Amino acid sequence: MKKCFAIFSMALTFSLAVMAQSSTNVPFSQYGLSMNTLPVSTPLAESMGGVVFSRAGSNFVNPFNPASYASIQPESFVFDIAMSLQSSRLNEGGQQYKDFAGTLSSITLAFPITSWWKTSAGLLPYSKTEYRTVMTQPIAGTTQNVKTIYDGTGGISQFYWGNAFNVWNDGEGKPSLQAGFNLNYLYGSVARAITYDFVASDTSFFQDTRRQQETRVSNITFDLGLLYRQPLGEKYTLSVGLTCGVPQSLKVDDKALIYTFVTYGSSEYTLDTIFPARGNNSEYESTLRQPLSIGLGLSLERNQRWMVALDAAYSPYSGMKYEEGVETPVFGNSGICYADNYRIAFGGGWIGNPTATRYIGRMGLTGGVHYEKGKLALALASGDWTLDEWGVSLGITFPMRKGRSQLVVTGGYSSFGSNDLLRNDVLSVGLALSSNERWFVKRKYN
């Protein structure tokens, strides 16, 4: 176990160092609680193209269906840590911008409470905000221009505590039903600003405007999950997974200002200030509605040899509102509305033969594809767009310690957006370590 914690410490230190030294410019992350890339951004999901709802095993933790924790074996302690490196290319109007980022994808653990009750806890990145966009436009009837600068940074993390139960399980080769739930704590902050900067030979007589907002999130959400397994003969098993994210209104704390200023040399001097909240106060509370989310997964497995799986997910984001309770929205009418979100993923491959005599036979080789109809719909003068994403990925599993632990290496490509607006192409490499230790064992001595 000491080796496991040593590897964990080194991986955590490396991941935090990479995160501190790199960033990714994602303009779409300026809306709502920013870009939620789960589950595809984690190596567990990426190894099969984003398939997660019907997957469960004794040597890894799947936080995307809480019912899967019930597959953890008695006397076991499973610990997972994963990281991801991403190289992105943003295409905007024929211009390309490249970025590189490293993130700690997940830290999870799971262990049994009783033979029928298992528990899990972990930390996941829920969303990330990182963008800076500059647009320069002429002012009608003048020789001056106005430069609009969009800035944003921050992110939301998710700490979860989950429990799963064997509703019925008559033994190996018999049908089984597992049920579980996750209690999620979302926390973090997102800072956004828009600056209207007048560009001229002498800007001393121009009043610039800045809108800025900081949103602090601290909320509890819930996920529910079911997993049913039906043996088909002696060799095959059909699994059906169902998940549900409970809809609710999230209370968030905001701090916002809209003010004008002038610049003399390198100094800014504030003139007039508007407080968007009710009353003469920069701090206020607003509401963000979190919609229902439903996930359904099907998989067919042949005796721990190969697997094929299909996922479908739906979230009715249309009608979702942002900055409720604010008399004067900080960012005004941005032309953005939310659209229903759909995701489909298909994956499979050789998952490894644990009894194979050659090591290559115990290795796993999997892959998959996914398509997602995005959360945002842009209502622009030239037409309507939905922001869609598609991607492909591969995964290689290296078993360790007689198959109780494993190292998963993944690689993937995804494309988000459109050529008519903005397109973000991402190459990613993931690394996940799952350690399955035998705890809670009473040793016998003669």
Annotate each language-model stretch with its function:
Residues 12-13, 75:
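Alpha-helical transmembrane segments and their juxtamembrane interfaces
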